[in-house]
Amino acid sequence: MNSLYIDRKNLSLQHQKDALLVFDGEHRCATIPLRLLERIIIASQVQISANTLGKLGSMGIGVMVLCGYQ
């Protein structure tokens, strides 16, 4: 997996050690090893902390945020 596309609303992204955790409310939807990712494309309303963005950047993982007009 090189690219992770996120298009579901109201998810939150967190990191724990070298994994990206995807939550829908309190429920963890996915755990993805960061070593598998080159980029993350976000195409919906997602919550992500500066700490997690920093971890992604330190591992060379790009983050692209797409904004569509409604």
Q: Which residue stretches match the model-derived regions?
A:
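N-terminal intrinsically disordered, cationic/polar leader segments
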Residues: 1-70
